[in-house]
Amino acid sequence: MRVATRRSRALIRATRSTLGDRLEPLSAELKWLGGALGPVRDLDVLLERLRVEVAALDLEREGGESIVAELEAEREVHRADLLAALGSDRYLALFDTFTAALDSIPQELAGTAQTLAAGELRRFEKAAAAVPEEPTDDELHGLRIHAKRARYTAELGALTGRKRFVRYVDAVVAAQDVIGAHQDAVVAEERLRALVSPERALAAGRLIELERARRRDSRARYREVVDEAITRGRAAVA
C-alpha cells in the first residue's frame, strides 16, 4: 500500500502540467496515509533482514535477539496507530476521493505516457549527473527518489505494451533496488546505534559490520545500473 501511495503522488506530481493543481489536496492526503504506513513498513524491512542475521550469530545471538525484540515491540505500537488511521473517517474520505479521481483522470491523460516518462527521465539524468564521484548518503538517497519517480512514469509507458518501455522499467527497477539497498543499510545502522547497550554491544557491532558491507557493495554497483537505466530510458522515449 505504501508503494501505491508513493506511485500515486509521483504521478500527480508528473501530471501537474496537464491537470493543474486540482489533485494537490489528494496528494496531501496520500502523504498523510504514507506517513501512517511508513513506520510499520520500515520496521518490516529492517526486521526481515535482522532476524536472518541474528540467527547466524554465535556468542552475540542473545544481544541480537534483544535488539529484534525491542524493534518488534516498537512495530506493534506503530501498527496500532496504522490500524486506527485505516479505520478513520479521514481514510474513508480519501478512498472516495481517490476512486473518483480514477474514474475521471485517465481519459485526460490518454496518450501522455511517453511525455510524462520523458520528463521524469530528464530529471533523473540531471540528478545522476550531479552526483559526485564519492557521494554522501543523502546524495544517493536523493538519486533514489528520482529513480522511483522515473520508474512510476515508465510503468505507464509499459502499459502500452511497448518492449522498449518494458526494458526501461526493468532497468530502472534494478537501479532503484541497488540504491535502495544502500539507504536501507544506512537506516539500519542508525537504528542499531540507537539501540546499543552494554549487553548488546557485540551483537550491534557485528550487525553494523554487515550493514556497512551492504553499503560498500551498493556504492560499487550503483553507477553502472543507473547508467543502464538512463540508456534504456532514452531508447524508450525516443
Show which residues each predicted segment covers.
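Function-determining surface determinants
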Residues: M1-A238
